[in-house]
Amino acid sequence: MTAVTALSVASEIYPLIKTGGLADVAGALPAALLPHGVTMRTLVPGYPAVLAGIESAAPVHSFAMLFGGPARLLAARKGGLDLFVLEAPHLYDRPGSPYSGPDGKDWPDNAYRFAALARTAAEIGQGLVPSFVPDIIHAHDWQAGLTPAYLRYSGKPQPATVFTVHNLAFQGQFPRELLATLGLPPGAFSVDGVEYYGSIGYMKSGLQLSDRITTVSPAYALEIQGPQAGMGLDGLLRQRAAQLTGILNGIDDKVWNPATDKRITATYDLDHLAARRANTQSVRELFDLSLDPDRLLLGVISRLSWQKGLDLLLEALPVLLAEGIQLALLGAGDPELEERFKSAAQAYPGQIGVMIGYDEDLAHLIQAGADALLVPSRFEPCGLTQLCALRYGAVPVVARVGGLSDTVVDANEMAIAAGVATGVQFSPVTGDMLAAALSKTRALYADRAAWQALQHNGMTADVSWRNPAQHYAQLYRSLLAARQSRATA
């Protein structure tokens, strides 16, 4: 097995900084690749949380000027992660999230903040750190999308590139007037380069200029080649279909393990499912729900947004209430949705509980205590919460889209008869169909044998990174072999 060295480029990484699933992927993939002969380091921005969380740091390069100020590249570690951290206080030392300020508005200099990340990645790929020259650069989402552009237009030898789309809805578009300031030549602003409807498209750059494209589920790879999910980039994705692959995400099964999870009230496994009820009791107490052990407890852990379909849950509340289902919702996002869910909790105390925000400990407890977990997304590239739900014995109730349809086997008659069902799917993604799915879920819950079969199938499914990592390693090697073949032809 030929050894491969790879640089991952990501705007967030668990456990240092996380706003979504990208962080989980960036944090788990390096360790998963090691058994497949791939050594990966990850380049991340030096946000305050990152600099505070790393365990060691040694400067390996200094930039006198990087988009408005001096910067340093640090070699660092966090647990088992080998990192490069771009320390640029003028770009990253500020409050708020990685992408927006405390007021929720995008940082006005995001074009430079993430161009700096991409340019540094490209320079590492071309020998900036002599002790680490990667064979592959694997860039994630629009924040790293300029990486192949900086490589392509440098005129220098370059490593192979892979670009992964985690969510096509966020594309990183900026004024064309920034082209020269970003250090890109005039020729880069073309339909075959970074130009996208008159702007500079960071996502478009990654899709256009990388050697291979992946996205986080086979179904989403197909969906984004059509106009509904393609978000204006479907034509390009159809054009590059031969270079596009869908590889499912996994979850870190050491972090997400109900038998060892220190964040939950009681640990359990498939042979000791009765211990799970202590977690259900804790969720009910925390969300001020009535302590009725016979009621179905439905969990939601989600950003409150149109994409995530949480407005559809509000439409389906009459059915949820009539079925006697309890709801424990943890999430934040759209202020209107937040207020509507808080109002529902006030109107139906004991049956609906809502906590606005996000808390990792509570997310683990909901997975361990909810009977079912709802993911009603209008589109979902992969989704991780349903994978965690499978692992924890919370039966997933999901919209039949993207990675949700790839990872949850609907409890229809054929799947139940074959003994392979793991959850409930619904389609089309409407309030009425969600309501019907809730009624179906309640009926399944009433059949204890059927419900336990769903839990058993979910908890025995392999949702780890083992298979995805093997697919990525194969992709890297096939790409390097193709390059070698062209070089010797």
Swiss-Prot record:
Superkingdom of the source species: Bacteria
GO MF annotation list: alpha-1,4-glucan glucosyltransferase (ADP-glucose donor) activity; alpha-1,4-glucan glucosyltransferase (UDP-glucose donor) activity
Pathway annotation: Glycan biosynthesis; glycogen biosynthesis
UniProtKB keywords: Glycogen biosynthesis, Glycosyltransferase, Transferase
Gene Ontology cellular component annotations, sorted alphabetically: cytosol
Any GO BP: glycogen biosynthetic process
Function according to Swiss-Prot or TrEMBL: Synthesizes alpha-1,4-glucan chains using ADP-glucose.
Protein family per UniProt: Belongs to the glycosyltransferase 1 family. Bacterial/plant glycogen synthase subfamily.
Full protein name: Glycogen synthase
Taxon lineage: Bacteria, Pseudomonadati, Pseudomonadota, Alphaproteobacteria, Hyphomicrobiales
Gene: glgA
